[in-house]
Amino acid sequence: MNKITCICLGVRSMERSIHFYRDKLGFKTDCKENNPRVCFFDTPGTKFELFPLDLLAKDISADNPPVIGNGFGGITLAYNVDRKEKVDEVFELVRNAGGNIVKEPQNVFWGGYHAYFTDLDGYYWEVAWGPNFKYDENGFLKF
């Protein structure tokens, strides 16, 4: 078990979240309706899924669903880019889309350039560029 095939985010409003990711940030999906039961986005190598938060909690355990909260859960999602300037470009897109800027783009101790934002449900995203980031022929990050 050494591959992540799908990342699922439980969201409070499918319509609002689909609009944010599909229409504002440009994620590709076959979701035609704005309030489906589930929505998958195509990202290279991994599916990205939105699912209603309350239904996701019940799917995990109908008898004892996890408590839904607003706190930081110790996980971030990341989008790594191939040019330093792209971090600023992505953050302008996020800002215009209504994302919450948590940390403005800045140089970081390891020689890179990064920033953080949260989406409409409070999930943390890092956008980062590194001088030593290398990508394969499919655009996948190699370390």
Language-model regions, residue ranges each:
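Vicinal oxygen chelate
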Residues: I4-R12, C39-D42, A62-F143
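N-terminal beta-strand motif that seeds the catalytic metal site of vicinal oxygen chelate
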Residues: M1-I18, G74-Y79, P131-F143
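Core segments of cupin and vicinal oxygen chelate
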Residues: C8-A57
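A short, acidic/glycine-rich surface segment
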Residues: A57-N64, K134-E137
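Short linear motifs in intrinsically disordered
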Residues: G26-K32, D82, P105-N107
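Short coil/turn motifs at secondary-structure junctions
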Residues: L55, D82, G130-N132
